[in-house]
A protein has these predicted regions:
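Sec-dependent signal peptide recognition
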Residues: 4-12
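Generic detection of intrinsically disordered/low-complexity segments and helix-coil linkers/edges
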Residues: 11-14, 331
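C-terminal motif of bacterial Sec signal peptides marking the signal peptidase cleavage site
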Residues: 17-19
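Non-catalytic structural scaffold of enzyme domains
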Residues: 21-372
Length: 372
């Protein structure tokens, strides 16, 4: 009987790997942490096993580094781009996510993710899984070191991973863990959201301006989900000014794809200044220099920038409608903020944070996007 208890989780792992049909990328193994959870069917695995995605109750968990997660939360809370009755793209003076509860998990403890992805990708994957697990817990704390400071918390019905690196280092393993427990994890990433936006716009050729560490996330997702798109990932140094950096990106694209045109550039940044980028695009269009003329030939007349705030807002709305997860309550969205911390046992727990903490991580008013 003991031997069977250890064999069954292994079989569950294999079944989960095969059943991840939504992203038919290269079959790969999950990290040791997830396998460990599968063998120990108490505690964390039991928590995941009791998770339910049916019905409309539960929160939308936004998981990521503090500055980005705070900004995305503000964008989602303020969004009014569609008619809540028929879903058509027209404002109706009612928040798109009316009645929804957002739980924002601010992972300052493990930020920046880019450094972790470069030095220890498996560690970043484990971080993503741990954060997903605490998102489905019904308990939070006011003090991570005091187990008596328990607070009630919503269990997540949707996971919004607010970083492209979490799409590469985490999404697969979160999905695998939940499938091993016989559950479905509803996950949204900026990678899939922006590629979906490009595809539904009818675009054929796009560049993704992203760090080298995020390259495989976009390439794998494009092959699996949007194979009709010609996707080229371009990385620049990222230490200079934005407008010259955009020109550097175009120079690299010309080298990688000589003679090709661009329908759009997908921005792997929640905080990029779209006004500056649009101004540089218009400057190029005036064709003052030979390089301007060369760049202008690359950019299609309908060229635009696709950024994750707008793409994820639209994708989240469509996802909730598709899976019938809207609460349908007539009320303003509620937002609660939690910081990821370790307790005395080294476990991740969500700690509710104050408005003072939030203002320290929101450096400017968030850009509120329009959705085509």
């Amino acid at each position: 009987m003991t031997r069977m208890k250890h064999i069954l989780p292994v079989l569950a792992i294999l079944a989960a790997l095969v059943s991840c049909h939504e992203r038919p990328a290269v079959l790969r193994d999950t990290i040791p942490y997830v396998k460990q959870l599968a063998v120990d069917t108490t505690g964390t695995f039991q928590l995941v096993s009791t998770y339910r995605t049916t019905g409309t109750k539960g929160s939308i968990a936004v998981i990521g580094e503090p500055e980005v997660a705070v900004q995305l939360a503000a964008v989602l809370r303020q969004a009014d781009q569609v008619d809540n009755i028929d879903g058509l793209p027209k404002p109706d003076r009612l928040p798109d996510f009316a009645g929804e509860s957002f739980d924002i998990l601010l992972d300052e403890y493990n930020a920046p993710y880019l450094r972790m992805a470069a030095s220890s990708p498996d560690s970043l994957t484990e971080v993503a899984v741990r954060n997903a697990v605490i998102a489905v817990d019904s308990v939070a704390y006011s003090n991570a070191l005091d187990p008596r400071s328990r607070l009630a918390k919503n269990r997540a019905k949707v996971f919004v991973l607010a970083n492209s690196l979490l799409a590469e280092y985490g999404q697969f393993d979160i999905d695998t863990l939940f499938k091993m427990a016989g559950r479905e994890a509803v996950i949204l990433t900026p990678v899939e959201a922006m590629l979906e936006e490009a595809a539904k716009s009818g675009y054929k050729s796009v560049a993704v301006w992203a760090p080298a560490e995020a390259r495989s996330a976009y390439e794998n997702a494009a092959k699996a989900l949007q194979p009709q798109l010609d996707v080229t990932v371009v990385s620049t140094m990222g230490n200079g000014l934005l407008r010259p950096a955009f020109r550097d990106m175009l120079r690299i694209y010309r080298t990688l794809k000589p003679g090709s045109n661009l329908d759009a550039v997908l921005l792997d940044s929640f905080t990029a200044n779209l006004e500056e980028l649009s101004a540089e695009k218009e400057h190029i269009h005036r064709q003052i220099t030979e390089e301007d003329m060369a760049f202008d030939r690359i950019l299609m007349p309908h060229f635009r920038f696709i950024e994750p705030n707008a793409a994820m807002t639209g994708a989240l709305y469509r996802l909730l409608r598709e899976k019938n997860l809207f609460t349908h309550d007539i009320a303003y969205p509620t937002v609660r903020y939690y910081q990821t911390e370790e307790n005395r046992d080294g476990e991740y727990v969500p700690v509710e944070v104050s408005a003072a903490y939030l203002s320290a991580h929101q450096k400017s008013e968030p850009y509120v996007p329009d959705i085509d």
